A protein has these predicted regions:
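Metal-dependent active-site segment of extracytoplasmic phospho-/sulfohydrolases and closely related
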Residues: 20, 28, 50, 229-273, ...
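Active-site neighborhoods of enzymes that stabilize oxyanions during catalysis
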Residues: 289-419
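A short acidic-Thr-Gly-centered motif at the start of a beta-strand
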Residues: 1-15, 243
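Short, structured active-site-proximal loop/turn typified by the sulfatase FGly-forming signature C/S-X-P-X-R
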Residues: 31-81, 128
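Short catalytic/ligand-binding loop motif for oxyanion handling, primarily in non-cytosolic enzymes
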Residues: 28-30, 71, 87, 135-141, ...
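Acidic/histidine-rich catalytic neighborhood
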Residues: 239, 256-306
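Anion (oxyanion) recognition and catalysis
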Residues: 55, 121, 242-243
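His/Asp/Glu-rich, glycine-adjacent segments
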Residues: 81-221, 297, 303, 309, ...
Length: 420
């Protein structure tokens, strides 16, 4: 048996194509789920017959995502098989102490370990990666050699701009008959699946990784017509992939919850005015790690925040103040949060805050443009969005009763645990 080692985990060499899918924002069905979960409701409504069939012959359960339950840390956990304390990506956005600047965490320079893709390419595997948003692309494709013709990595967002030297393929928009998708649409994810299926047909990757957008999930709850149609599209493509005798593994980077009141107004805890009751603004810095270029999705409002203080002596008073606030679930000193959530201590600040299920955390009213929110707010980032799907189209007997699964166990499950 041939194995590849990456970050102290051994992975069996695939004997058939392995397709791992991160369905961004795919809230699963479980007792505390929002609306019964996207996949589960779509199955109930007859929109996902292929995944319905997997319930009886594969693995169909849930797992825990990494906290914060955001896109970047969880995608990188999935593709490295490690938590953030190992790979270093603590959010979509952070305060870089070295440069004294607030920056997007999109640069591969922030990565502290290699990816499963790189480890397999080094041993001769063919790797294909398609992500919806370009913000992830460089990190997912970090250190891959595109010149040798055994790796492809591009985003649906910028598919028409790809080159062989940078992405392993020229003009990836030609892979399908679909028009170049709008980044603020479900079509962005449909393109990911369609192009992935084309690569399975024509390029024969050993490992195919698909990472979608959560635009639909931010706008539409489980079981709604738009959500069901979106998941029906996914089911159709999964069935086509099954025809290639592929191992298909599905998980998510985070769930998604409604964050608004009965009138549709967002439930927001603004942190700055609360802390200003104790400290002047130049004595603290609030970081909202959900922040990314796609504010139409969420308005930079999520369930997780970190706070940097000029004087560590202020930690306890600030923690006490925030802990008493409605809408806040946890307020932790950084050392405790890093141990509990396996976060890199140098990228977290002094205090970590998570919101309650129906609430989000904001900076101040002036900081957020709520006019970008065309529907009642749905978002993620906290503990209430940690549960995600964990689905395999082949049996995995050893995982059926496993008490603890993480979304970053999905490559281990697909490569090491599936049986015919």
């Amino acid at each position: 048996m041939r194995y590849v080692t990456c970050n102290n985990r051994k992975y069996r060499w695939p004997d058939k194509p392995v397709v791992v899918i991160c369905l961004d924002g795919s809230e699963p069905g479980y007792p505390l789920s929002d609306g019964g979960g996207y996949i589960d409701r779509a199955i109930e409504n007859g929109q996902m017959p292929y995944l319905a069939s997997i319930k009886n012959r594969g693995l169909f359960r849930t797992a825990d995502a990494t906290i914060p339950s955001f896109t970047n840390p969880n995608n990188i956990s999935i593709v490295t098989g490690t938590p953030p304390v190992v790979h270093g990506i603590s959010g979509n956005f952070f305060y870089d102490l070295g440069s004294d600047a607030e920056v997007m965490m999109n640069d591969p320079a922030f990565l502290r370990v290699g990816t499963i893709f790189k480890a397999f390419q080094d041993q001769g595997a063919r790797i294909a990666i398609i992500t919806a948003k370009d913000k992830l692309r460089r990190m997912l494709g970090h250190e891959l050699d595109f010149e040798q013709g055994s790796a492809i990595c591009f985003s649906a967002e910028k598919c028409q701009l790809t080159t062989r030297g940078e992405h392993g393929i020229d003009d990836a928009s030609q892979l399908t008959d679909l028009p170049t998708p709008d980044v603020y649409s479900g079509a962005l994810s449909e393109y990911v699946f369609s192009a992935g299926l084309t690569l399975l047909d024509t390029w024969s990757p050993d490992i195919l990784y698909l990472s979608t957008s959560d635009y639909i999930q931010h706008k539409h709850g489980p079981g709604t017509p738009t959500a069901d149609a979106f998941y029906g599209m996914i089911d159709h493509h999964l069935l086509e992939m099954q025809a290639h005798d592929a191992v298909i593994a599905v998980t998510a980077d985070h769930g998604m919850k409604a964050k608004h009141d009965s009138a549709g107004q967002p439930n927001i805890v603004y942190l700055k005015p609360l802390i200003n009751e104790l400290l002047p603004s130049d004595r603290f810095r609030i970081i909202l790690p959900i922040t990314d270029p796609y504010v139409v999705h969420h308005g930079a409002l999520g369930g997780f925040a970190t706070i940097y203080l000029a004087d560590p002596a202020d930690v306890q008073p600030v923690c006490h103040k925030l802990s008493a606030q409605k809408g806040i679930e946890l307020v932790l000193e950084a050392s405790i949060a890093c141990e509990r959530f396996s976060l890199p201590p140098d990228r977290v600040g002094h205090i970590v805050v998570t919101s309650s299920t129906e609430w989000v955390l904001g900076h101040s009213q002036q900081y957020h443009d709520l006019s970008t929110l065309s529907e009642p707010l749905r978002s993620h980032g906290g503990l209430s969005e940690q549960r995600v799907p964990f689905i395999l189209n082949y049996p995995a007997p050893l995982l059926v009763a496993s008490t603890t699964l993480r979304n970053y166990d999905i490559f281990d499950a697909a490569l090491n645990h599936t049986t015919d």
